[in-house]
């Protein structure tokens, strides 16, 4: 699976669906996250909880054995295409910059995407069930 920022923020902030999302992570032996999404998640978490929040993020990723995947040229191209097709102001999905990198890693790797919300459901990316 590819983990999107929305899912990880929900887990780290103990939102009502956090347990369900963590269960999905536990059930999938493949756990990846784009380095672009990692930065986006760190920005969100550290803006709310400071550096201790960032340490909790890193600890969670370590304990869950999530592999951070560097953005390469193929992913950058896929992210660009995602924005062209599904970007904010262009499509109802309204993908933002960070969303495009989660989408791209899922498409390039062939892994389903774990996310919260409805935006990705309006795209052609496979979702974690």
From Swiss-Prot:
Q: What SUPFAM superfamilies would the database entry show?
A: PIN domain-like (SSF88723)
Keyword Nuclease included in the entry's annotation: yes
Q: Which Gene3D superfamilies match?
A: 5'-nuclease
Q: Which InterPro entries match?
A: PIN-like_dom_sf, PIN_dom, Type_II_TA_system_RNase, VapC_family
Q: Where is the PINc domain?
A: 1-124
Induction info reads: Expression is low but constitutive, and repressed by VapB-VapC. Translation of vapC mRNA requires VapB. Member of the vapB-vapC operon.
Q: What does this protein do?
A: Toxic component of a type II toxin-antitoxin (TA) system. A sequence-specific endoribonuclease, cleavage occurs after the first AU in the consensus sequence AUA(U/A); RNA secondary structure is probably important in substrate choice. Cuts in 5' and 3' UTRs. The TA system acts as a post-transcriptional regulator of carbon metabolism; in M.smegmatis 3 TA systems (VapB-VapC, MazE-MazF and Phd-Doc) may be involved in monitoring the nutritional supply and physiological state of the cell, linking catabolic with anabolic reactions.
Q: What is this protein called?
A: Ribonuclease VapC
State the gene name recorded for this protein. vapC
């Amino acid at each position: 699976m590819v983990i999107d920022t929305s899912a990880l923020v929900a887990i780290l902030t103990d939102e009502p669906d956090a347990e369900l999302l963590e269960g999905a992570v536990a059930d999938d032996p493949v756990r990846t996250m784009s380095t672009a999404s990692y930065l986006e998640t760190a920005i969100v978490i550290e803006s709310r909880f400071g550096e201790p929040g960032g340490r909790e993020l890193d600890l969670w990723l370590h304990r869950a054995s999530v592999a951070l995947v560097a953005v390469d040229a193929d992913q950058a191209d896929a992210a660009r295409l995602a924005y062209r097709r599904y970007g904010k102001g262009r499509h109802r999905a309204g993908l933002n910059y960070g969303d495009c990198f989660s989408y791209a890693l899922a498409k390039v790797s062939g892994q389903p995407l774990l996310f919260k919300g409805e935006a990705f459901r309006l795209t052609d990316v496979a979702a974690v069930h």
